[in-house]
Design a protein with these regions (language model features):
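Solvent-exposed, polar/charged alpha-helical surfaces in well-ordered, non-transmembrane soluble domains
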Residues: 95-99, 103, 203, 207, ...
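Short glycine-enriched loop/turn motifs at secondary-structure junctions
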Residues: 191, 301-303, 558-560
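Short, gly/Ser/Thr-rich active-site loops of penicillin-recognizing serine hydrolases
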Residues: 553-554, 559-561, 654-695
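Conserved helix-loop functional segments at active or binding sites
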Residues: 321, 325-329, 356-359, 582, ...
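A conserved hydrophobic secondary-structure block that centers on an alpha-helix together
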Residues: 295-346
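Beta-lactam-recognizing serine transpeptidase/beta-lactamase-like catalytic domain environment
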Residues: 70-71, 76, 286-298, 311, ...
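A generic structural motif
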Residues: 83-86, 642-646
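Membrane-proximal periplasmic segments of bacterial cell-envelope enzymes
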Residues: 1-275, 281-294, 299-300, 329, ...
Length: 695
C-alpha cells in the first residue's frame, strides 16, 4: 500500500511540475507580447487588411507609325460576389434577386449575359436554338445537367426547373433565371471566382443597383477594361477580336494564372500574341489603420505589351476603300468579294492586307448574327485563307523557270496560232493575239497560252515547273503570323494523294495557271515580291516589334527573314521584268497603271469557276492582278483578287490607288478606268479544265 501511495504522490508532483512549466512559458510569452512588443501588436490588432485582384491592362496594337489601332477604355461590369450572394441552399432567394435584376436591366434597355441555347416556339413549347449545337452538347454534358445526348429541350428544362426550384415561375421568367443559373455553374461561381452578370453597363444603372444594395444582396460593380478602336473598320481581319474565356480555353490557360472571368484573344493578332497582350494581374492590398486611414499597395502587376504592326493605317484605309470601290463597281450577282495585299519587296513586311466584304470591330458582337449568316462571309479573311486558280499570273513563274532551265532564252520564239495541237488534242489561245511569232517578253505582254504550252508544258515539264514555283512560295506557307491557307501546288504526287491520276494535259494547263493549282492572294503577293527583288523570298510578317506597356523596353524586334535565295540570273529576271512592264506600256493595263507617274510592271490573270447559285451551276470569272513598283528599283508588290471580276485588268485600279498614295502622285482615282472584257488577255482560254483535254 505504501508503494502505491508513493507512486501516486510522484505522479501528482510530475503533473504539478508540468503545469508550472507551462504557466512559466505562457507567462514569458505574455510578457513578450504585452511589454516587450506591446506597441507592435497593438497596432497590428487595430489594423485590418483586405486583398483583391487587379486586372492587368491589355496591351495596345499600333501601326508602324505609332498610330493606335486598338486601345483600352474602362467600363462597369455587374458581378455576383459569392461571399455575400445567397448560397445554393438559398436558391429561392437567388432566383428572386436574379429575376429582379433582369427586370431592371430590361426596363433600362440594357443587355445582360444570356447564353442558354433554349427558347420558346410560337406555341410556347421549349425548343433548342438553331446553330447552337456546341452549347447544347455542353448543356447536356456530365459537368452540367448530366443528361444523355438524345435529351430534348423539354428534358433539359425539366432538370433545370427541379434543380433550381423554378416550378412557380412563368415560362419566360424560367428561361431568364435558368440562363443565369446555368452560366453560374458553367463558370464555376465561388468566392474566388465572381460571376459576371452583365458587361459594360451604364453609370446610371450602376447607381440604381448601388442605391438598392439591400435588394441586390451580393451584387457588386467591377471596373473592367474594354477594347477601344479608333476606327473599327481598319484591318479587322488582321487585328481580330477578344472575348470571354470559354471552358476549353480555361482548361489550358488556368495553369498560366488565368481566371474564369478573363478576356482572351479569339482571332487575329489578339489571339496569336495573347501571351504578350495579356500581361500579369496584380494583388491590391488595402490596410485600414485604427484611425481609419488607409494604405494601399499593388504587387506583381504587369500591364500587357504593345504590339507594333508592319501595317500603315493610312495605306490600309486606301487599300480597303479601293477594293470596296472596284468590287462594288463590278456589281454582278456572281461577285462574292475580293482581297488585296501590299508588301515591302525587300523585307517581307505586309504594309496592307484587306478582305472584302468586311466588318466593324467596334460593333462586332452586336452584328455577329447577321455577319455569320451573310452568304459572302465577311468574317472570312480572303487575303490569307481563300485559294484561287491563279490564271495567267502564274505565267511569270513559268517564264522564269524556262529561262533558268535553259529550255528558252530571251530570243526564243514560238508561232502562236489560235489552235495548239498536243498529242492529237487541241488547246486554244486567245483570239486577240493569234497568228504571230512571239518571244518570252511579248508572251507575257499578250499572255500567250501557246508559248507557255510549248516551253512550259512540253519542254520544261511539271517537275521543273513546280521546283521553281516552290522556290517562289506558291503553294507554300508564307510564315505570316495569323491563320493562312497553304493552297495547292498541283502535281502527280498531289493527284495521287487524292486518288486521282495525273494526265498529260495537266502539265500544259498548269503552265498557264490552271489545272488544280490554288493559291492565296498573300502567296501571289509574296511571289511577286520575290520576282521583283531579283529572287530573294522573305517570310511574310505583320508584326514589326513588341514593346513594353510604356514603350520603354523592346521585347521583340522582328528582322527580315530570308526563306529562299533562288539564285536567279540577273539577265533572266530582267527579261521577265521587261515582259511585265510591257503589260503596262503596250498591253491590257495601259488605261490604269499606264497613267501613273511611277513606273509599274504587272501581270493580269483570269480563271473561270463553277459556282452553285440558287441551286443551279453557273460559271463566273475571277480576276487577278499582280504588280510591283517602281519598275527600276522595286519597293512595293501588290496582289489583287476579285471574285466575279470581268478581267484581270479590271482589278488594276485597286493597285493604282495604292501606288498613288504611297508614291505621292496626284492622279485622280477616276482616271484609273476599269476596262471592258474585250481588253483582257485570256478570258476565253482559262475556263474549267475540259476532260477532253486531259487524255
Amino acid at each position: 500500500m505504501r508503494l502505491a501511495h508513493e507512486e501516486k504522490k510522484g505522479r501528482y508532483i510530475a503533473l504539478i511540475t508540468i503545469f508550472v512549466c507551462l504557466f512559466l512559458v505562457f507567462g514569458i510569452r505574455l510578457i513578450n507580447i504585452q511589454v516587450v512588443n506591446g506597441d507592435k501588436y497593438a497596432t497590428k490588432v487595430a489594423s485590418s487588411y483586405s486583398t483583391s485582384v487587379v486586372k492587368a491592362a491589355r496591351g495596345q496594337i499600333l501601326d508602324r507609325n505609332g498610330v493606335v489601332l486598338v486601345g483600352n477604355r474602362q467600363g462597369n461590369d455587374i458581378i455576383f460576389d459569392a461571399s455575400s450572394f445567397p448560397s445554393f441552399s438559398e436558391q429561392e432567394k437567388r432566383n428572386e434577386i436574379i429575376l429582379s435584376l433582369i427586370n431592371l436591366f430590361e426596363k433600362k434597355g440594357e443587355a445582360w449575359i444570356n447564353e442558354l441555347p433554349i427558347t420558346l416556339d410560337s406555341s410556347g413549347n421549349y425548343q433548342f436554338i438553331e446553330d447552337r449545337e456546341k452549347d447544347i452538347t455542353k448543356l447536356k454534358s456530365r459537368d452540367m445537367l448530366h443528361l444523355n445526348k438524345y435529351a430534348t429541350a423539354d428534358d433539359c428544362m425539366s432538370e433545370i426547373i427541379e434543380r433550381y426550384s423554378l416550378a412557380d415561375f412563368q415560362k419566360q421568367d424560367i428561361l431568364k433565371i435558368a440562363s443565369v443559373c446555368i452560366n453560374m455553374k458553367s463558370n464555376v461561381f465561388n468566392t474566388a471566382n465572381p460571376y459576371i452578370f452583365a458587361q459594360d453597363v451604364s453609370d446610371e444603372l450602376v447607381s440604381v443597383i448601388k442605391e438598392n444594395s439591400t435588394t441586390y444582396r451580393g451584387v457588386d460593380v467591377q471596373i473592367s477594361t474594354y477594347r477601344e478602336y479608333v476606327d473599327g473598320t481598319i484591318a479587322p481581319h488582321i487585328l481580330g477580336v477578344t472575348g470571354a474565356i470559354d471552358a476549353e480555353e480555361y482548361a489550358v490557360l488556368k495553369e498560366k494564372g488565368y481566371a474564369m472571368d478573363d478576356i482572351v484573344g479569339k482571332s487575329g493578332i489578339e489571339k496569336v500574341f495573347e501571351e504578350n497582350l495579356k500581361g500579369k494581374n496584380g494583388v491590391k492590398t488595402v490596410k485600414t489603420n485604427s484611425d481609419g486611414t488607409q494604405e494601399t499597395s499593388i504587387d506583381g502587376l504587369k500591364n500587357g505589351d504593345n504590339i507594333v504592326l508592319t501595317i500603315d493605317a493610312k495605306l490600309q484605309k486606301v487599300a480597303q476603300d479601293a477594293l470596296k470601290r472596284v468590287c462594288d463597281s463590278i456589281g454582278t450577282a456572281n461577285a462574292g468579294g475580293g482581297a488585296v495585299v501590299v508588301m515591302d519587296c525587300n523585307t517581307g513586311e505586309v504594309l496592307a492586307l484587306a478582305s472584302y466584304p468586311t466588318y466593324d470591330l467596334s460593333t462586332y458582337f452586336e452584328d455577329y448574327a447577321s455577319l455569320a449568316k451573310n452568304k459572302n462571309v465577311p468574317l472570312y479573311n480572303r487575303a490569307t485563307l481563300s485559294t484561287y486558280a491563279p490564271g495567267s499570273t502564274a505565267k511569270v513563274s513559268t517564264a522564269i523557270a524556262c529561262l533558268e532551265e535553259g529550255v528558252a532564252d530571251a530570243s526564243s520564239t514560238k508561232y502562236c496560232g489560235y489552235d495548239y495541237n498536243f498529242l492529237g488534242h487541241h488547246f486554244v489561245c486567245q483570239i486577240n493575239h493569234a497568228n504571230r511569232t512571239i518571244n518570252v517578253r511579248t508572251a507575257l505582254q499578250d499572255s500567250c497560252n501557246s508559248y507557255f504550252y510549248y516551253y512550259g508544258g512540253e519542254m520544261l515539264g511539271i517537275d521543273k515547273m513546280n521546283m521553281y514555283r516552290e522556290m517562289l512560295g506558291l503553294g507554300q506557307p508564307t510564315g505570316i503570323e495569323i491563320s493562312e491557307n497553304t493552297g495547292v501546288l498541283d502535281s502527280p504526287s498531289y493527284r495521287a494523294s487524292i486518288n486521282q491520276t495525273w494526265m498529260p494535259g495537266f502539265s500544259l494547263q498548269s503552265a498557264i495557271g490552271q489545272a488544280g493549282n490554288l493559291f492565296t492572294p498573300l502567296q501571289l503577293c509574296n511571289y511577286t515580291a520575290t520576282i521583283a527583288n531579283g529572287g530573294t523570298r522573305y517570310e511574310a510578317h505583320l508584326v514589326k516589334s513588341v514593346l513594353s506597356s510604356d514603350n520603354s523596353v523592346s521585347v521583340l524586334e522582328k528582322q527580315p527573314k530570308v526563306v529562299c535565295n533562288t539564285g536567279f540570273s540577273e539577265n533572266n529576271v530582267k527579261t521577265v521584268h521587261q515582259g511585265m512592264r510591257l503589260v503596262v506600256t503596250n498591253g491590257s493595263c495601259q488605261n490604269n497603271f499606264g497613267k501613273l507617274d511611277v513606273a509599274v510592271a504587272c501581270k493580269t490573270g483570269t480563271s473561270q469557276v463553277e459556282k452553285n447559285i440558287n441551286g443551279s451551276k453557273k460559271v463566273y470569272t475571277n480576276g487577278f492582278n499582280i504588280s510591283f513598283a517602281p519598275y527600276d528599283n522595286p519597293e512595293l508588290s501588290v496582289a489583287v483578287a476579285i471574285e466575279g471580276a470581268r478581267s484581270g485588268s479590271s482589278c488594276a485600279p485597286v493597285g493604282c490607288d495604292i501606288y498613288n498614295y504611297y508614291f505621292g502622285n496626284n492622279t485622280s482615282d477616276d482616271s484609273t478606268d476599269i476596262p471592258e472584257d474585250e481588253n483582257e488577255e485570256d478570258i476565253y482560254s482559262e475556263g474549267p479544265v475540259d476532260s477532253n483535254l486531259l487524255f
